[in-house]
């Protein structure tokens, strides 16, 4: 048995060194053409090493540190913070999934949060403006709303900027608050990927098998059923209605931002982006994205503000998107610039300016 496990581990290391989709994608897209391949491999290795706990909902384990990612003691990506907030601090949380977390960011400083913090630091104000990255990979609207209600409100936020809407192609899942007895053991097993490639290679092998059985565009759970999106959008809208009402009750503002998606704006795609638009068309929300954007009019009645970001890359000629929804540092900076403009009125109002 030990020989089999050792063989699987060695094989996994050899295969993933050449076939890791994160590394090959970053390399082929030339989205980081000024970075060495060793830097890109490190970025992907650090991403794969992040440890998550699954109950009561998926969240980052605290106190994780690599060359490109830091998870603080509160489970947020970025520098350390205190839960209590001084009177002269204006606290902003960025909420969302992998795009907000910064899945392909080269550092904590090149995420939405990192760029937004840098811009806000240039303001001449007596307040300390604190931007916290509450993004978590694979979060949908239910996950984010649960995170807000059970965790973020305990940090006394002044402003929540929620990047959401592109995941309505799949039904939102309810959060299971019942913690299984094996949970502590599973948390310990999750740490194995810090030392071994076998868990990652197992997932890689499983995906290869599924693609061989069902084809590139037939893997179960990936295809968006557009006839179901309208119902999903209604649930999505009601979720953020509830959070915006909570903001009124607890004295924090909520901005809902619909993120850019490849093909949803008027950006002329590069060859890499065009390739993905064709290859990943079965996973694209674009044919139904208008339903999400139209819903912003309703959310405006409850939330502090809403914004449609789908056109912010229209004037960009280079590659922005790595796939259909994820982009690298250059895209993060453009999104942060828009979020900066949106946040200013709410900050100045609370600061008395």
Describe each model-derived feature in a short phrase:
Residues 14-17, 103-107, 143-145, 171-177, ...:
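Short, solvent-exposed loop/turn and secondary-structure capping segments
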Residues 7, 12, 236, 296, ...:
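Histidine-centered active-site loop/cap adjacent to the catalytic His
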Residues 4-21:
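Membrane-interface motif at the C-terminal end of an N-terminal transmembrane signal
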Residues 22-119, 123-124, 316-317:
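Membrane/wall-proximal cationic-aromatic binding patches
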Residues 91-94, 119, 127-155, 160-207:
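Internal alpha/beta domain cores that form substrate/cofactor-binding pockets in large enzymes
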Residues 89-90, 127-129, 155-160, 248-255, ...:
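Loop/turn elements at helix/coil->beta-strand transitions in domains of secreted/extracellular proteins
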Residues 165-297, 314-318:
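Serine-dependent acyl-ester chemistry module
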Residues 99-107, 133-134, 229-233, 282, ...:
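Second-shell loop/turn segments in exported
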């Amino acid at each position: 048995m030990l020989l089999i496990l050792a063989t699987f581990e060695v094989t996994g290391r050899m295969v993933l060194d050449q076939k890791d989709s994160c590394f090959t994608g970053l390399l082929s897209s030339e989205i980081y053409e000024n970075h060495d391949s060793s830097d890109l491999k490190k970025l992907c290795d650090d991403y794969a090493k992040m440890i998550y706990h699954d109950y009561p909902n998926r969240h980052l384990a605290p106190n994780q540190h690599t060359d490109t990612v830091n998870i603080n003691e509160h489970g947020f990506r970025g520098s350390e913070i205190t839960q209590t907030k001084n009177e002269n601090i204006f606290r902003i949380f960025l909420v969302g999934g992998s795009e907000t977390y910064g899945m392909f960011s080269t550092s904590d400083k090149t995420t939405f949060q990192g760029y937004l913090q840098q811009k806000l630091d240039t303001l001449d104000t007596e307040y300390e403006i604190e931007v916290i990255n509450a993004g978590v990979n694979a979060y949908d609207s239910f996950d984010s709303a649960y995170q807000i209600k059970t965790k973020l409100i305990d940090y006394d936020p002044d402003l929540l900027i929620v990047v959401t809407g592109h995941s309505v192609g799949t039904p939102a899942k309810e959060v299971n608050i019942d913690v299984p007895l094996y949970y502590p053991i599973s948390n310990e097993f999750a740490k194995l990927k810090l030392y071994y490639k076998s868990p990652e290679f197992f997932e890689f092998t499983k995906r290869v098998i599924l693609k061989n059985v069902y084809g590139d565009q037939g893997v179960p759970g990936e295809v968006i059923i557009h006839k179901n999106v309208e119902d999903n959008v209604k649930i999505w809208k009601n979720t953020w209605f509830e959070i915006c009402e909570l903001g009124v009750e607890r004295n924090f503002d909520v901005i809902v931002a619909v993120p850019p998606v490849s093909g949803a704006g008027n950006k002329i795609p590069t060859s890499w982006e065009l390739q993905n638009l064709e290859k990943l068309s079965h996973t694209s929300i674009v044919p139904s994205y208008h339903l999400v954007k139209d819903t912003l009019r309703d959310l405006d009645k409850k939330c502090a503000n809403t914004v449609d970001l789908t056109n912010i890359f229209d004037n960009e000629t280079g590659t922005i998107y790595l796939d259909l929804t994820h982009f690298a540092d250059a895209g993060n900076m453009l999104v942060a610039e828009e979020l900066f403009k949106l946040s200013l009125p709410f900050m100045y109002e609370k600061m008395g300016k």
